[in-house]
Structure formats: C-alpha cells, structure tokens
Amino acid sequence: KYIFDENFFFFFEEIDLCKRIKNINENIFVFNKIKIFHEGGKGVDTKIAQNYSDFRHWNYYWSRFYYHKKHYGFIYSLFIHLSKLIRFFISFLALYFFSKEKFRKNKFRFFGLFSSIIGIKSSVSKDILNKN
C-alpha cells in the first residue's frame, strides 16, 4: 500500500514516506526505546571510505532539495537552499588551497544540491562509489 519513492537514494526516503502517510491521516508508530549504534564506514579501507563519504555528501543535499521540492514546491525549496548552494560553491573554491578534505566535502555537497536543482537523477551518484 505504501511504498518508498524510488527517486530518493540513500537519504530522506523514510521521512518522505512518513509525511505521505501523515498527509492521508494514517498512523505512524515510533519506538523510541530502541537504540542502534552505527559506526559509519569503519569496516572499509580508506579509499572506499572516502568514496562513501563523497557519496553521502552528494546524496544528502540532493535528497534534501528533492524532498522540499516534492512537498512544498520548487520555488520554496530553491529559496531555502540557495544560501547553502552559494556557501558550498564559495567554500569549495576557497578551500582548494587550504584544506583538501573540506574542499572535497563542499564540492560534493555543492554538486549534489546543484544536480537536484537542475533535475539530474540521484542514481548518477552511484558512480562516485566506483571511482578510483
């Protein structure tokens, strides 16, 4: 009856599903006594971990924009994300000479958000995981 939106890839899919269920006045049950500890990439080698980190940064901002666009419209989503887009762009340019790690993080955030704004599908981000 309720399915995940396959346009989401990696982030916001459960938030979207809950919002859609709530919009039709159905119930959502929360078990707040359950705790899960996740170490996030601790079991992979450094190169794979870097690709995974790039992938996460790209997908988080892609999904964040898409979620807001889907539920509140393109203009609203653009309005709330425009300052981030500008900040990520300036940061990734400025940090190139000072911090390669922060440069890389902001570059993937910028391109994930920009890709969502111009309508590129989130599935292209899988290529980030396979790069050398």
Q: Where do the protein language model's features map onto the residues?
A:
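Generic alpha-helical structural signal
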Residues: E6-N7, K102
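Solvent-exposed, flexible loop/coil residues
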Residues: F8, F12, G40-G41
